Amino acid sequence: MRIEPIIQGVVARSAHPFGCEAAIKKQIAFVKKAPQISQGPKRVLILGASSGFGLAARIALTFGGAQADTIGVSFERGPSEKGTGSAGWYNNVFFKREAEKEGRIAINIVGDAFASETRTQVIEAIETYFEGEVDLVIYSLATGMRPIPNQPGEFWRSVIKPFGQTVTGASLDLEHDRWIDTTLESATEEEALHTIKVMGGEDWESWIDTLINAESIAQGCQTIAFSYVGPEITHPIYLDGTLGRAKIDLHQTSHSLNLKLANFDGAAYATVCKALVTKASVFIPALSPYLLALYRVMKDEKCHEGCIEQMQRLFATKLYGQDHISVDGERLVRMDDWELAPHIQNKVNQILEEMDANNFQVIGDYQGFKNEFLQLNGFGFDEVDYSQDIDLQTILKLTP
């Protein structure tokens, strides 16, 4: 069978196994040539390891100088007679293959990170492969819902809405290359609460508590989770909306976890990353035009970073091998420093003032935006022959 990209709106319905392999190899090649991570962690647990920042962190820590062994948790779908499976499934497969070639331990646990059974599996894997302790825990779950404990079949569901106001902005339909004006109504208090439950810090803290209780935290263990703040132009839909409330909760959680890990001479940080095309970010209405302008400007200025560049720089220049960890006044590690530089934002704002449905593909980096989205799912790589038929039985044997 031939695997073609299938996009519905902003959702990819297909993934190319060997395109995903190409993506993994490309990221590995980058981190091997980049400034290396020194004094890095050796035993790392990544919650949400199969795409985006979680996957990039895993690649950076394994191949970018630290030579870390990793346990990755993700909720992915394998190939079947009905479909190709998810990109994350193949990312897990090919990451493990490449890591093991270099003698690294790479354990994939495919399961619901919210489920108690998954936690039990993780603790057992730490005992078996890591001599019972971890040096770094990365929390990078991106999901729209979370099961309510002790209420089978009931979920908290996050929403992406402004708070206290109606916001009008544009979304991009990647399927038809269209600009769609959208209006978002204000969230209710209940919607905001649900979003905090799904995307805030409660589950992160619960995981760390589980690891502490299992005596799985090594001396000096750190934990990080990823956040976004953005410039003022994005605040109505992001920082001042339901997502922002959840991220503020995440930031506050980092402080309480920092106190808990102080008992192990460790620390906890929320890491503010730059705006990027990820499976999650393309869902945020009104953020896409900003991304088009930002990509254009940062590429022109030769300071554009994707997930892998961000993660390698984070571990090589901010979190490890430094006399002290540089944080802002709120104890946040800022990886959005290049994005928020005044000269970058001034140029972004100039483009946004002119951008509309007629010219967004010309004055913004729409081609780069869409290609990055396709590459998340294994498409758009020059080195892959997409005309080649793929035998279903071959990919059914690819297990993480």
Curated annotation (Swiss-Prot):
Its EC number is 1.3.1.9. PANTHER family: ENOYL-[ACYL-CARRIER-PROTEIN] REDUCTASE [NADH]. The active site is at Y238. Involved in the final reduction of the elongation cycle of fatty acid synthesis (FAS II). Catalyzes the reduction of a carbon-carbon double bond in an enoyl moiety that is covalently linked to an acyl carrier protein (ACP). This is Enoyl-[acyl-carrier-protein] reductase [NADH] 2. It comes from Vibrio vulnificus (strain YJ016). Pfam families: Eno-Rase_FAD_bd (PF07055), Eno-Rase_NADH_b (PF12242), Enoyl_reductase (PF12241). Monomer. GO terms for molecular function: enoyl-[acyl-carrier-protein] reductase (NADH) activity; NAD binding; trans-2-enoyl-CoA reductase (NADH) activity. GO terms for biological process: fatty acid biosynthetic process. Substrate binds at Y228. The record marks E76 as: Plays an important role in discriminating NADH against NADPH. Belongs to the TER reductase family. Pathway: Lipid metabolism; fatty acid biosynthesis. It is an enzyme of class 1 (oxidoreductase). NAD(+) binds at residues 48-53, 75-76, 112-113, 141-142, 247, 276-278. Keywords: Fatty acid biosynthesis, Fatty acid metabolism, Lipid biosynthesis, Lipid metabolism, NAD, Oxidoreductase. It comes from the Bacteria. It catalyses: a 2,3-saturated acyl-[ACP] + NAD(+) = a (2E)-enoyl-[ACP] + NADH + H(+). InterPro entries: Eno_Rdtase_FAD-bd_dom, Enoyl-CoA_Rdtase_cat_dom, FabV-like_NADH_b, NAD(P)-bd_dom_sf, Trans-2-enoyl-CoA_reductase.
